[in-house]
Amino acid sequence: MQTKAKNKNMNIKSITIDGFCNIENSIIELNKISSIIALNNYGKSNLIKAIDFAQTFLNQVPKKRNSMMRYKPLIPINKKIASRNFIFGIEFETNFNSLKTLVYYSFSFEWVKDDGKKGARIVGESLKYMPLKKDARYKTIIKRTITKSLYQSSKTGRCDNEIKIGKNELLVNKLLNFDNLFYFNLLDEINNINFAVVDSLSNPDRLFRTISD
């Protein structure tokens, strides 16, 4: 799997997946070369599918997202994780305000319930950043729960500006309409992340072609 973005300075550090098929709270830490090793039927392919699913979800229109949250073959059926929401998180390093900065973005949604009426809604979203310097801490600029969606509108403000958003919409998409936000470049980077999933065993030429692009 190869990761790409518009900003060549972006360096993806880790990916978090939860609530997808048999995947529970899994964190992949990425280096230049990373391997996923496990016994057969332990979910290696599901982990890759989950990352591809998250990328598709991130870039889809609300109507398509509604269908994705209702796709039963991907909903966890193991009793231990059957009620877990889908969670995707990505941590990356980039240049922001002329400083090397660590950024963490995540979203979560509730899978459709058995009755087909409840669930199928985005229930959480967060974006925070931390300059890579001494004593720095993460600062939240997007925060969303089931009941409220907040964002920070200025460098000196707080993450307390409420915005209306649909249950199938993502703040990181909607806020691209506010091109005066001081963190607009971070939003743009997240919206342009691309995971190239390549089966190099069946088609190795695709892998080399992807890397050379």
Spans of model-derived segments:
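Hydrophobic anchor at the beta1->P-loop junction of P-loop NTPases
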Residues: 36
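The conserved Walker
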Residues: 40
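Electropositive, glycine-dotted interaction segments
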Residues: 100-213
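A generic structural motif
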Residues: 18, 91-95, 128-132
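Conserved P-loop NTP-binding catalytic core
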Residues: 48-115
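Conserved lysine of the Walker
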Residues: 44
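Phosphate-binding P-loop
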Residues: 25-31
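N-terminal pre-Walker A segment at the start of P-loop NTPase domains
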Residues: 2-24
